[in-house]
Amino acid sequence: MSRMEGLMMDFPLTLTHLLRRAETFFGDSKIVTRLPDKSFHRTNHRETLRRARQLAVALRKAGLERGDRVATLCWNHYQHHEAYFGVPCGGFVLHTLNLRLHPNDLAYIASHAGDRAVIVDRALLPLLEQFRAETPIEHVWVVEDSYEELLTTADPDEWEDPELDEREAAAMCYTSGTTGRPRGVVYSHRSSVLHALGVGANNPLGMGVGIGDAVMPVVPMFHANAWGYPYLATMQGAKLVYPGPCLDADSLLEDMEQERVTWAAGVPTIWMGILARLDEEPGRWDLSAMKAMLVGGSAVPRAMIAAFEERHGLRICQGWGMTETSPVASTVALPNDLAQADADTRWDVQATAGLPLPFVEIRVRAGDQDVPWDGEAMGELEVRGPWVAASYYDTPESADRWTEDGWFRTGDIVSMDPRGFIQIKDRSKDVIKSGGEWISSVEVENALMAHPALAEAAVIAVPDEKWGERPLAAVVLRDGASATADELREFIAPQFAKWWLPDRIEFVAEIPKTSVGKFRKIALREQFTAEPAQTS
């Protein structure tokens, strides 16, 4: 029997559609940027996207060709938003450079990607000059300076839809892993549009962003497409609030209050700082418009989720993903029975990585076997879907990150409960293998973080002659607080088997972090495997 074909149009999924849609239907929706001097710049989607078309024309007039990489070295602001659309909608590839990386890494990344041009914030010019000579960059346009001159060379009405193939590259981002060279992930127009639809779907697993919302991406635009929020908000006509370089807690809280932010997204370290300020001055900021704060990048301590809700009436929604998954692949939402459950039960679920978004498929593997969904058995999380990378850019030596049947090996060790909620246990390189058993550093960290005296806690494996590895905790005390190692061990003891408890607890001034706010555990391992124990 012959199959019957559908009779629907073959309509390309490209970012040009989002641009035209926002200009046509949501032109008056606002885009607000906090400037370096703490003042505000206000514009709207219509004007910003007009300038994006102007940028697309100007890049072509400057001699750039289809597929050329245009880098940005910028904070979150409206000009960066213009590049998010003007570059890919002109047929070029947006390459966001992580301004927190070392110049040597930036030189490698810009060279490996083949960047021909860069748009850079004036304040970041000294950083650019440290590595530009080692790259193929030909053009430099400075925000608020030569960037504006570039735009004057073009008329936005000269822009013509380049009739892009939806599978053409739209953007690039390099991983910020703590081992090996950064690796390039190339997002297509299709994957970017589908990711925006998946993250923003008005269903229990999506964020449900609409025209009446105000979205604030605290997560940087220089990494993983700012979790897709610039595209999602533009697609839905939502107001956008960009914090610029002003990431101190007071500035962010002022932004949220003044602009009536309904959705905000950032890494746990950002929200820890905000929680501390809310605790110090409860009631100072009116955050009644806030629907939820999306947290990702590393596991969220259950204690933080409880503190925001109990003390301030604010909801934390955890998400999980990676640069390779565009980046959001799962989010937490509570089915009706769990939404009506007691607080402890709800917080247990909210502390998971949630359920996969539509079109993202997951499995948990130990060796060549699937791990049962019992909430106990652990294995490596593997994913596939339309916004999951199929390979790295020009890095054939990393092909082993994909299975023979096409799944991406995330490197995250997880368990799955019977309903499919993902519990991140550890990174495969960070799990502690003690006496043939696994200890989850993340679970011990989150338990320690519930202690009122601690601001941060990171747990690592250190070599042990008898057990192979044993856990060591590096902890940071809150200002004015005190605690002893024995007190901290006693605090978490009811939650774990005795052999899970850290043999050493080290008090440190700060925990080193990666460019995207994750703990740099490799630095801690180097420090504490070279030093004798100070506390035990």
Regions found by a protein language model. Name each.
Residues H41-R46, A170-L197:
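Conserved AMP-binding A3 loop
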Residues M235, Q258-G266, A276-D348, E361, ...:
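Gly/Ser/Thr-rich phosphate-binding loop
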Residues I31-H77, H81-F85, H102-A107:
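Conserved AMP-binding/adenylate-forming core of the ANL superfamily
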